[in-house]
């Protein structure tokens, strides 16, 4: 019973350490003018590659006619593993068909730069084949790897939601400024129109007085 409790305490401690180390990993900030790519090396075939991205800061209004960004993942062999079209943010996950350098590219069809918060993780959990090959690899290490991947999934979701929240705040601020500019412009237009009306009325009265004198 005591040994079981000790194991639980060890796993809890390991979980806290892993969670702290994972939380220290920050998302990449990529500015996409035309096309920008990020490379990540996958050590083992069959590893799970996952991540997310969100367009955080943009200089133009994302209306219904905005095409969004294109996202493409290319394998070391040059094959397209995954692609997303016309999006302002999404999640992705796939099994690596082989080990090697993978390329993650963003394409911006507009000339206006877009800032993207990009997060990627390569997860590896040893399987029975790995245990058979490596006699020093025990089931405890496998459990630790599984725990790490579970925590990584939670942290990735937190980072995705945080990036979306940042984008919403930026959009709200941009909308607020746009409303203020529109309101100020409307007041200026109304003041100018009123001024022109006053001048026009005064001109009519001056013509009427001159006619009566004649």
UniProtKB/Swiss-Prot annotation:
Its main location: Golgi. One of its GO terms (biological process) is protein transport. InterPro entries: Emp24-like, GOLD_dom, GOLD_dom_sf. Residues 28-178 are lumenal. Pfam families: EMP24_GP25L. A motif (Required for the export from the endoplasmic reticulum to the Golgi) lies at residues 213-214. The chain crosses the membrane at residues 179-199. Residues 1-27 form the signal peptide. Residues 35-122 form the GOLD domain. GO terms for cellular component: endoplasmic reticulum; Golgi apparatus; Golgi cisterna membrane; plant-type vacuole. It is a single-pass type I membrane protein. The keyword rRNA-binding does not apply. Residues 200-214 are cytoplasmic. The keyword Transport applies. A motif (COPI vesicle coat-binding) lies at residues 204-214. Keywords: Coiled coil, ER-Golgi transport, Glycoprotein, Golgi apparatus, Membrane, Methylation, Protein transport, Signal, Transmembrane, Transmembrane helix, Transport. It is found in: Golgi apparatus, cis-Golgi network membrane; Golgi apparatus, Golgi stack membrane. Probably oligomerizes with other members of the EMP24/GP25L family. Associates with the COPI vesicle coat (coatomer). Associates with the COPII vesicle coat (coatomer). Belongs to the EMP24/GP25L family. This is Transmembrane emp24 domain-containing protein p24beta3.
């Amino acid at each position: 019973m005591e040994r079981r409790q000790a194991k639980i305490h060890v796993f809890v401690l390991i979980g806290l350490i892993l969670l702290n180390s994972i939380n220290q990993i920050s998302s990449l900030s990529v500015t996409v003018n035309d096309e920008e790519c990020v490379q990540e090396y996958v050590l083992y075939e069959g590893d799970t590659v996952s991540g997310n991205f969100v367009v955080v800061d943009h200089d133009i209004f994302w209306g219904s006619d905005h095409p969004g960004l294109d996202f493409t993942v290319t394998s070391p062999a040059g094959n397209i593993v995954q692609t997303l079209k016309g999006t302002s943010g999404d999640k992705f996950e796939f099994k690596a068909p082989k080990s090697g350098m993978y390329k993650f590219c963003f394409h911006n069809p507009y000339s206006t730069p877009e800032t993207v918060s990009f997060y990627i993780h390569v997860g590896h959990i040893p399987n029975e084949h790995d245990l058979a090959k490596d006699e020093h690899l025990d089931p405890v290490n496998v459990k630790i790897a599984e725990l790490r991947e579970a925590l990584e999934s939670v942290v990735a979701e937190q980072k995705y939601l945080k990036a979306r929240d940042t984008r919403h705040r930026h959009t709200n601020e941009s909308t607020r400024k746009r409303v203020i500019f529109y309101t100020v412009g409307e007041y200026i237009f109304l003041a100018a129109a009123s001024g022109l009306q006053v001048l026009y009325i005064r001109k009519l009265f001056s013509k009427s007085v001159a006619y009566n004198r004649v």
